[in-house]
């Protein structure tokens, strides 16, 4: 199989995801604009309350404007790195038996949904980016815009790990009929581990160093910290390395679960 054919096929899957999400425009508007706007507003109010309650001008060496900028960009990056819609679809394909139709086609299950995820995240990023951009300019919050390309590169690289974890969870549907619950538990854990809830450097040692070293910090804390001047480029390269290790380990587990599951699978779909 040539690379050109591989690229065209996956580009078609990505376009399919974009078109299918834009088909219901009101739903997409709520998903891409309203939801991140509300999330950002809640987190900003939270940090206002924290500083007012503490009666301090700085927390851990950073003033209120840095935490407001973190909340703005944090809600945006968290929206990109969160995956549940395609994870649910993958689980449903296996659980219902309709995966049979995918197994006989000239592409892998992983590839089919990964391309759709990336297409969906790409268009959602372009649309929802208006929210933090407008807010940052209105409130004049610290942001190093020249760092955006590298921050986005890390975020979309991290999406490979996100999808790989979703693939592992979906493969669990070969063995469990309540695997949907794992998705909810995983998303709650990542809410903390990515740094969406609060910056990871506010944690006490050694928990702080452990959480930052884990690949999940690449979801929110590292790109947002780098973008707002909280972190320097060395932490970004370390995060790239950590995500790479995570991708290798998780995909090895996923490949093993998938092969074993397919071998014993008895489908009921067409």
Predicted regions mapped to residue ranges:
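Hydrophobic transmembrane alpha-helices and immediately adjacent juxtamembrane helices
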Residues: 1-270
């Amino acid at each position: 199989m040539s690379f050109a054919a591989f690229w065209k096929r996956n580009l078609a899957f990505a376009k399919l995801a974009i078109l299918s999400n834009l088909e219901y425009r009101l739903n997409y508007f709520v998903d891409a604009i309203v939801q991140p706007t509300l999330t950002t507003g809640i987190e900003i109010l939270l940090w206002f309350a924290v500083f007012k309650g503490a009666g301090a001008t700085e927390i851990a060496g950073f003033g209120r404007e840095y935490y407001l900028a973190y909340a703005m960009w944090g809600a945006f990056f968290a929206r990109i790195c969160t995956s549940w819609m395609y994870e649910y679809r993958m689980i449903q394909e296996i659980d219902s038996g309709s995966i049979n139709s995918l197994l006989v086609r000239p592409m892998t299950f992983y590839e089919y949904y990964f391309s759709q995820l990336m297409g969906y995240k790409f268009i959602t990023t372009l649309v929802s980016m208006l929210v933090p951009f407008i807010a940052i300019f209105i409130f004049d919050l610290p942001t190093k815009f020249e760092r955006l390309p590298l921050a986005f590169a890390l975020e979309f690289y991290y999406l490979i790990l996100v999808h790989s974890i979703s693939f592992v969870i979906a493969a669990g549907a070969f063995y469990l009929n309540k695997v949907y619950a794992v998705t909810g538990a995983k998303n709650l854990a990542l809410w903390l581990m990515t740094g969406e809830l609060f910056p990871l450097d506010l944690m006490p040692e050694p928990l702080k160093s452990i959480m930052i070293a884990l690949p999940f910090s690449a979801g929110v804390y590292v790109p947002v910290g780098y973008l707002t001047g909280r972190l320097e480029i060395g932490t970004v390269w370390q995060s790239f390395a950590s995500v790479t290790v995570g991708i290798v380990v998780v995909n090895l587990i996923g490949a093993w679960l998938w092969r074993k599951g397919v071998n014993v699978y008895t489908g009921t779909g067409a």
